Amino acid sequence: MAKVRILIFTLVLFFSLNVHIHGFYLPGVAPQDFQMGDALMVKVNKLTSTKTQLPYSYYSLPYCRPEHIVDSAENLGEVLRGDRIENSPFVFKMRESQMCAAVCRVKLDKKTAKAFKEKIADEYRVNMILDNLPLVVPVQRPDQDNVVVYQHGFHVGLKGIFAGKKEEKYFIHNHLTFTVRYHRDIQTDSSRIVGFEVKPFSVKHEYEGQWNEKARLTTCDPHTKRAVTNSESPQEVEEGNEIIFTYDVDFQESEVKWASRWDTYLLMADDQIHWFSIVNSMMIVLFLSGMVAMIMLRTLYRDISNYNQLESHEEALEETGWKLVHGDVFRPPTNPELLCVYAGTGVQCFGMILVTMIFACLGFLSPSNRGGLMTAMLLLWVFMGLLAGYASSRLYKTLRGTEWKRNALKTAFMFPATVFVAFFVLNAIIWGQKSSGAVPFGTMFALVVLWFGISVPLVFIGGYIGFRKPAPEDPVKTNKIPRQIPTQAWYMNPIFSILIGGILPFGAVFIELFFILTSIWLHQFYYIFGFLFIVFIILIITCAEITVVLCYFQLCSEDYQWWWRSYLTSGSSAVYLFLYAVFYFYTKLEITKLVSAVLYFGYMLIVSYVFFVFTGAIGFYACFWFTRLIYSSVKID
């Protein structure tokens, strides 16, 4: 009867709340309706290159400019990504196609010609935005018929041999054929933009008479319906040449609705690979789960039963294995404060990644919310300082520490300071290259304010709460005199077992890691957080189980120094992550500049460091729970 009343109350509460529920859109991603003839303002973003990894502002090149350049408001994530979104002279009218619209004429001097040549040689791409949709170039996949993939932006130009000449020349894409796809509402006749594509061409424009804004081009003419369809007579980049920038825009009605407009961009042709990755990782998990089950259900049960049935202390001493180290297994490790700091920081990383994954799977961090992912991760990291302080102080008190303020101070500064110094050095390198990817001083100051103003106080609050709580009691008493550790077999060597322990966690994620690195360094879309969340769960289970198994073998060999080894065992997967990053650099990337290589390895070192702290904490807490569980079941006289 009580359950029925609870059910009725729940239903009444639900329907009463449901009356006040209204749908909403995330800021900046709400649909915008356009009537025929409404102005469509195209915005320009950074110039990007996979060869240099150094973004530059669109107007760092002498492109056509509007009368006044206006910077768009950007969130923290966009600034850190190097986005520089500005207005442009490209203005369309909704559902009104244009042909051969002249934007401006630019005469190249030595400096501007050199700037264009450098960007063309480094294969820079121009990025634009219309109604929050990025500009893409549709390209047919050579290995699959009727499969089109979309590339971010269009190349500034191309380099090659033309008209039988022996020397390589530089040619600029000065004519853009835009295609704007829209979905029309029949009832209101309003339209929503669902696609923004371009085909770039290099055309040496010609005109009659003197140049002015209304000069009639002979190479493309809307009056005679002469359109640009190829680059048979390309525009060469050379000092003294004049370049006329033009564009066409064609509006095409589409059946794709606004809510589904990103599906085309995010369509993955590699789903089978992701499923293979998950199945492969699940096999690893099942194998490790079988080993853990065997240890817990057979070996431990038998050992504990036999141990508890021994009649005398002398008989207990004759036993070998993990039971003999019960008087030393909870002896505090060397440098316990550092272990507490890293354990607490690992909990902070875990909380940040977990909540970010949940938000991403719910769609809050979609690509339409540009910069949202990085902004969310930073803010979550700051607020998870509460968990870091709490976890660190709880462990610190368990290890009989007394200076909780010093421990909290180290937790608040050690890991963030290391990452911040590395980030500051890399940012200085980017600044030296005059790249727009350099984080401005104001943003850097905002990061410091978030760190000192929010994260550090939260770490101390968490530390205070954690230290006030009584420390969990050890299941067994610790002997006053440490037990001598016998000579270990070669396969139980700490370095060997630690490195072996990191292979399986890395094996669970390395296929997904390939797609993540590709999205970051080759500027491709990544929005398969469903797959990633499954892999994330598999990684947690794998880290926990492999560390528990190796910890059990270590205790069976009468080595009770498991504290640091448990952290390093799963954390060593970060070593393999960095080695894979090196492999990826030499096999997939075409980076040629030393500065770009330094940036790549610098950022991958930071990522590997975060991965080490995150996976290390998982393995450590798994062993912390495991040792307390098995030794609490042993009867000690």
From Swiss-Prot:
The name this protein goes by in its record: Transmembrane 9 superfamily member 10
Organism: Arabidopsis thaliana
PANTHER family xref list: TRANSMEMBRANE 9 SUPERFAMILY MEMBER 10 (PTHR10766:SF154), TRANSMEMBRANE 9 SUPERFAMILY PROTEIN (PTHR10766)
Topology term for the membrane: Multi-pass membrane protein
Principal location class: membrane
Similarity comment text for this entry: Belongs to the nonaspanin (TM9SF) (TC 9.A.2) family.
Lumenal side: 24-274, 366-370, 433-444, 516-527, 588-593
Organism phylogeny: Eukaryota, Viridiplantae, Streptophyta, Embryophyta, Tracheophyta
Cleavable signal peptide: 1-23
Localisation per UniProt entry: Endosome membrane; Golgi apparatus membrane
